[in-house]
Amino acid sequence: MSTETIEIFNNSDEWANQLKHALSKGENLALLHGLTPDILDRIYAYAFDYHEKGNITDAEIYYKFLCIYAFENHEYLKDFASVCQPKKKYQQAYDLYKLSYNYFPYDDYSVIYRMGQCQIGAKNIDNAMQCFYHIINNCEDDSVKSKAQAYIELLNDNSEDNG
């Protein structure tokens, strides 16, 4: 084994210890790799631009990168979910929306609404209904409530037609 290889292993152990220490304190990977908030904002701008232009495949690449390096950012999670959903990656989108909701400091019931849509796409109608009823029972935003109510009525009508 060359001295260069040994040096890499020594540095790797040191880096691993630094990583463990930083992560145990709740620091994100972006800071550990020198990705400043400004750099992350610029990457997010690219992702958002691709997303707005309908290029969800490229947007997904950037959102995934952002989530890896700044996982606690609810906007990154929500936007990553929003590109997974039209690609019919319903479970992944649902999980990302759920994480986004948990990281957001306020109740964003539009995220739960999207979670319900994902459950419909995944054919988990009971879970979708739970999402929509949660909105009806807890949300104060009439716009989101009316959309949830429309899904409840539609799903109830479909279950009566099929039952």
UniProtKB/Swiss-Prot annotation:
Record-linked Pfam families: TPR_3
The keyword Chaperone belongs to this UniProt entry's keyword annotation: yes
Signal sequence coordinates: none
Keywords: Chaperone
Residue ranges crossing the lipid bilayer per the database entry: none
Family recorded in the similarity comment: Belongs to the LcrH/SycD chaperone family.
Name of the featured protein: Uncharacterized protein YgeG
Gene: ygeG
